[in-house]
Regions:
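Nucleic-acid nuclease catalytic cores
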Residues: 126-171
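Surface-exposed cleft-lining segments at the edges of enzyme active sites
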Residues: 70-74, 103-110
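Acidic-basic catalytic patches of nuclease active cores, encompassing PD-(D/E)XK
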Residues: 1-83, 89-92
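Active-site-adjacent loop/helix micro-motif of nuclease/hydrolase catalytic cores
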Residues: 105-119, 144-148
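A short acidic, often aromatic-flanked loop/helix-cap motif at beta-alpha or helix-coil junctions
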Residues: 31-34, 167-175
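Conserved catalytic cores of phosphodiester-cleaving nucleases, focusing on short active-site segments
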Residues: 86-107, 125
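Flexible, glycine-rich phosphate/dinucleotide-binding loops
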Residues: 95, 106, 143-144, 173
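Histidine-anchored nucleotide/phosphate-binding helix
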Residues: 117-127
Length: 176
């Protein structure tokens, strides 16, 4: 599962489970969607398959506001650097600030360096307010789950409040 899909699945999960009523803001690096003429992630097909309808008039541009059919909250997709991959305002006033990474369930073992990179991005990407919930979101693989369980028990991860979201291809999310 690529990074753009992880980002969108996390946003959809929070909306479908009524965990937010606010617009969910996501930032997707254009290179994760397309480089030159090579499409890496067909964002239009994904949105169509998952009930996301573009709300603005520019249907050729993947950035913009999308409605998730049957839900109050929308997803606003941009490609703005330095704002985190997913920002979700929760009803209690806290804000999830998530860094997302790709992953495959294979023997290459990308999870360790990618999850460490996401933690580093959280630590250096923005100032956390008292209501910021820093989160690492990755595909739910055996290795990612093992690392999330182990790292979520570390005193320094607890002190900072980093949460882990393990994203499944069926759209389910395990929060640790």
């Amino acid at each position: 599962m690529g990074e753009a899909e992880v980002i969108l699945r996390l946003a959809i999960y929070y909306i479908k489970n009524n965990l937010t009523k606010e617009p969910v803001r996501v930032s997707i690096d254009g290179a994760h969607v397309k480089t030159g003429s090579k499409v890496h992630f067909d964002i239009f097909e994904f949105c169509n398959r998952n009930g996301l309808l573009k709300m603005d008039a520019n249907l050729n541009r993947w950035q913009g506001e999308y409605e998730l059919q049957g839900y109050e909250s929308h997803i606003i997709i941009s490609s703005e650097p330095g704002v985190g991959d997913v920002n979700i305002n929760l009803p209690d006033g806290s804000i999830i600030y998530a860094e997302c990474k790709k992953g495959k369930n294979d023997k290459r073992g990308q999870e360790y360096p990618l999850m460490r990179e996401a933690i580093g991005q959280l630590m250096t990407g923005c100032d956390f307010g008292v209501k910021t919930v820093p989160m690492v979101a990755v595909p739910d693989t055996g290795k990612a789950r093992e690392l999330a369980i182990r790292w979520s028990k570390l005193a320094q991860i607890k002190a900072i409040g980093i949460k882990f979201a393990l994203i499944s291809e069926d759209g389910s999310v395990s929060l640790l």
